[in-house]
Amino acid sequence: MLDREGFRPNVGIILLNAHNEVFWGKRLREHSWQFPQGGIKYGETPMQAMYRELHEETGLLPEHVKIIGRTRDWLRYEVPDKFIKREVRGHYRGQKQIWFLLRMVGRDCDICLRATDHPEFDAWRWNEYWVPLDAVIEFKRDVYQLALTELSRFLRRPAQRTDKSRGPRAPRYPRVANGHAASETPAAIDTSAVCSEVEPGANALDETPPRVSLRD
């Protein structure tokens, strides 16, 4: 479903824990991390789409979260032609998104990346609110920054920006799809076997992103 300008209606989700840390998911079989997001189906409201995508991508239910804010209007990004499948070029331009800021009121163990037969993520972790966005594919960085900035006014305690490094601190061990910590100590993680060790802001864009279709 595209609008007249070629943008697909979409929702994005910034999920916080009690420490104002943000959920990042590692895309299935890729070394890239992102926030949960997905298209709005015909007949859905943005809120309905948000709850559906939240469950499909994280396993969380409405009772596990509290809505604390949303963007006032659509935030748009265009997808470069080289990432668009040939059959939709000339029609599809990108995404227009309503972003929701959620507070998780459930427990970490409520997160399940295999809630559906077609999971989006195979690992997840919490990171600081203001991490460098190097891990985000370049054409999405501006919309991520806009969403984070607009929604930061809803935080209970303002999250402080940091310019310490090009990569984020890793306050929690990465979790693999079964929800358990990948390792007891960072040094013990075998990055060849556990992809979840790759952090947003590190080398998460080493692989070419998949091409975009209208189903993405």
UniProtKB/Swiss-Prot annotation:
Task: Please provide an example of a Pfam family that matches this protein in its UniProt record.
Answer: NUDIX
CDD domains referenced in this protein's UniProt entry, alphabetically: NUDIX_Ap4A_hydrolase_plant_like
An example molecular function term from Gene Ontology annotations: pyrophosphatase activity
Specify where the region named Disordered lies, as residue ranges.
159-191
Q: Which UniProt keywords apply?
A: Hydrolase
Q: What is its EC number?
A: 3.6.1.-
Q: Where is the Nudix hydrolase domain?
A: 6-149
Q: Which cofactor does it need?
A: a divalent metal cation
The residue stretches assigned to a coiled coil in this entry are none
Motif segment (Nudix box): 38-59
Question: What Gene3D superfamilies does this protein's entry cite?
Answer: Nucleoside Triphosphate Pyrophosphohydrolase (3.90.79.10)
UniProt superkingdom: Bacteria
The entry's family comment says: Belongs to the Nudix hydrolase family. RppH subfamily.
What does this protein's UniProt record list under function? Answer: Accelerates the degradation of transcripts by removing pyrophosphate from the 5'-end of triphosphorylated RNA, leading to a more labile monophosphorylated state that can stimulate subsequent ribonuclease cleavage.
Q: What is this protein called?
A: RNA pyrophosphohydrolase
**Species, as recorded:** Burkholderia pseudomallei (strain 668)
Gene transcribed to yield this protein: rppH
